[in-house]
Amino acid sequence: MTLKLYCFGESGNSYKAALSLQLSGLDWEPIFVDFFKGETRTPEFHRDVNTMGEAPVLVDGDYSLTQSGAIQDYVAEKSGKLGGTNPEERREILRWVLWDNHKLSSMAGMTRFLMNFLPEDKRPQDVIGFNLGRLKAAYSVLNAALEGRDWLVGDSISNADISCCGYLYYPEPFGFDRKDFPNIDAWMDRIAAQPGWKSPYDLMPGSPADRA
C-alpha cells in the first residue's frame, strides 16, 4: 500500500518526513497542503487530517501520524532503515532528533519565515537578530559533532542526519552559509549523494515560485 504524506515544499519539517520516506525505499506519494492559503487552519483540515493543524501528516491505510520525528521513527520501523543498528544507536538518533527540533529546526524555520515570507515592513528585526545568534550556536554544535566522522550516529545515514539537515538545503536566507561550516558542508554533500535524494522543492509540491 502506498503511504501518503500531507506536505508542502516550503516546510522543512515536511522535508524531514519526505526525505526519510524517499531514502527508505518505501512506496509513498505527496499530498499537497496549501499552507499559504490557510489550508491547515480550516475546520476541515483539523477534522479530517490533523487536529493539531500542522503538516506533515503520514497516512498508512487507516493509520495516521503527525510530527516529523514520530513519522521518521515510523518509517524506520516499517522499512528497517535509518533507525540505527542497536538500542544505543536508536537512543542516540532520538537524542539528535530532539536536539534538532528544539535548537535547530525550530529556530531555522521561524527565522526563515520571518526573513522571507513576511512583507518586508512586518519583519521584526530584533527577533530575527536574536534568532540568528541562536542559530549560529546550533550550527557550531552540529559542525563540531561531525568532526572526523561521516554521519551523526553510526556508520551510515540515519534519521539523525535527516532531521538535522531538514532546513539546510533551502535557498532562502536564514543565517546559514555552508562554507562557514566545513564539516556540515561535506556532510550535506554526502547526504545529497544518497540514491534517491532530492532537494525540498523537487521532492514535494509547492514552492515560492508558485506564488510569484
Positions of predicted regions on the chain:
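GST-like domain detector, emphasizing the conserved glutathione-binding G-site
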Residues: 1-129, 143
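Generic structural signal for helix capping and beta-alpha/helix-loop junctions
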Residues: 15, 38, 188, 208-209
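A generic structural-conservation signal
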Residues: 30, 84-85, 155, 180, ...
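Conserved beta-strand edge residues that scaffold enzyme active sites
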Residues: 35-36, 160, 205-206
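Active-site-flanking alpha-helical
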Residues: 76, 167-168, 201
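GST-like fold's C-terminal all-alpha helical module
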Residues: 88, 96-195
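Terminal-tail/helix-coil boundary detector
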Residues: 197-212
